[in-house]
Amino acid sequence: MAQVEKRGGLLRKSSASKKPLKEKVVLMYDEIFMTEDPSKCSPRFWEELFLMKVNLEYLEGKLESLDGEELMKIKDNINCLFQHCIQALGEEHPIRVVNALQTLCALIRGVHQKNKSTSGFDIINMLMGFDKAELCMKNLMESLDSLLCAEGSESLKSLCLKLLLCLVTVTDNISQNTILEYVMINSIFEAILQILSHPPSRREHGYDAVVLLALLVNYRKYESVNPYIVKLSIVDDEATLNGMGLVIAQALSEYNRQYKDKEEEHQSGFFSALTNMVGSMFIADAHEKISVQTNEAILLALYEAVHLNRNFITVLAQSHPEMGLVTTPVSPAPTTPVTPLGTTPPSSDVISSVELPLDADVQTSNLLITFLKYSSIVMQDTKDEHRLHSGKLCLIILTCIAEDQYANAFLHDDNMNFRVNLHRMPMRHRKKAADKNLPCRPLVCAVLDLMVEFIVTHMMKEFPMDLYIRCIQVVHKLLCYQKKCRVRLHYTWRELWSALINLLKFLMSNETVLLAKHNIFTLALMIVNLFNMFITYGDTFLPTPSSYDELYYEIIRMHQSFDNLYSMVLRLSTNAGQWKEAASKVTHALVNIRAIINHFNPKIESYAAVNHISQLSEEQVLEVVRANYDTLTLKLQDGLDQYERYSEQHKEAAFFKELVRSISTNVRRNLAFHTLSQEVLLKEFSTIS
């Protein structure tokens, strides 16, 4: 026995002195990296190569290790490998196809990685050769299209989408990725739509398909005609649009669920008990610890669908059971891909068909509700750059929705009432609202709640001016619709008025600090004009005459804030400083608010003196207001119900370029080609002839 151990030891010692044996595929890669054509000595070289398990790390690493000159010496072999990969995609043997797809991924990534450090290095020439590029890419795109549309292997479809995502995201700025010109010419748009319109393929590949489409839409969108934009804008197939909506809703629901789970876990833990003991002193820190990474890729897809396709607006209101409440048996899938920005798409559709009988006991939801909940989480904390971008994109999407006539129709529909549990930022001075006490209301109430919540919770040193302006614009556009269509919305308008006045107070108390960074008068003017909208047209859209009385009560009650604002803008408009013009606009806009204050205040004081009351109740003030409307004179202000429509190209191009760059980087970082193990593939393709 001791002798056997000794022999074993000797064997180990001798083997340690030798170099580890290279696997055959690595030896074959080494032959490709020689200047000679590897098929000269081995006529079956390319045929054998695609039967070997791909070694992605070695192939990519080898490409990265060569300098530009060395790489150019083996260009013919690289071109040959690329062309044989494309040929292999047409093979009957699935293993060859899988290996060809993975090899293409490694080639594209490896050559692009090399390009970052080599100036004047042309990727198309290096991969395919200029003379063959057009035909190569045509054949590649046709093969991918066929594989995606075929009824074959789901694993192959998954790899095809990953190859396309790899192709699109190899450069941070996708508009500089010249290979995408061929993806524009040889469109795979219909293949993407087919995936989204069929429930089985949507369950497996919907997420990757939607992200891919969102990225392709953003290729040189401002410089040239992008066929994916044109085609997306005219899609009217209900199954396809609903499929896209479901994929987006599931990804956002998954985010909402993850956040809720972390929140509950956090609240039930030791830290929660500690914060309760010390009066929630550390509530901000506690909140930061339960943040979940945002999913900007899926949000971009939602934006493009809402912005480009008017038919998609109907999908926002498509009712279905709330995804978090419905459980469905999940069949084991061969892969669980890690998706960009840390969100894994649900492995099964909550809804298997467009039409679904609804259980009266199950809370119904829709894509818009899911999006509003997502927005309420993301918009809580805008200090982080990703959340700031996500918060901005949420407000841009809401802007597009608030401008759409059909969207407004269902937002304000009294027959479409929902209970929407928005997340509210933990704040020391208010109690957590009980979700069960929320009433069922038209969806516009939830949008307004979200805007009020944002206004109240972001008055801070690092003031998000851009987000505030967008928030007020959303409110204004909704009011314009209500005025135009005479919609009398039963909403707690007082909460909005109070939030707006508190925002004005914040702007005034932080005048010096804020003016160093922002033109606060733009925002102040918008707030004042919202009040002017209520004053001038409130009788056409406020729910009751008493609501209009309450508006006047709030203005009179908070008259000191409006007086202080007037003093501030008057001071700056009479000085010859940079804010003169901006401040004077606010001065003029305050004319009716000041008229109300100056008209009613003396009458209230007189009423108090006559009746020997030191402090009037709300009802007594309202009594004075109602008795003195007739003698109030107001000026008619033009343009209060007009607004500039949203335009991406002129104002938002820089934001979207940066956002797409960030998404591209994250998609590339999270692409997982190893989710398909060779064992799984061999099991799936066990019938290789």
Curated annotation (Swiss-Prot):
Is this entry keyworded Cell inner membrane? no
Q: Which domain of life is it from?
A: Eukaryota
Which ranges does the record mark as transmembrane? Answer: 520-538
Could you confirm whether the keyword Manganese appears in this record? no
InterPro entries, A to Z = ARM-type_fold (IPR016024), ARMD3-like (IPR039868), ARMH3_C (IPR013636)
* Main location group: Golgi
Annotated membrane topology is: Single-pass membrane protein
GO process annotations (BP)? regulation of Golgi organization
Q: Where, per UniProt, does this protein localize?
A: Golgi apparatus membrane; Cytoplasm
What keyword terms does UniProt attach to this protein? Cytoplasm, Golgi apparatus, Membrane, Transmembrane, Transmembrane helix
Gene Ontology CC annotations of this record: cytosol; Golgi membrane
Protein family membership: Belongs to the ARMH3 family.
Q: List the PANTHER family hit by this protein, alphabetically.
A: ARMADILLO-LIKE HELICAL DOMAIN-CONTAINING PROTEIN 3 (PTHR13608:SF3)
Role = Involved in GBF1 recruitment, Golgi maintenance and protein secretion.
Summary of subunit composition and partner proteins: Interacts with PI4KB. Interacts with GBF1.
Protein name per Swiss-Prot or TrEMBL? Armadillo-like helical domain-containing protein 3
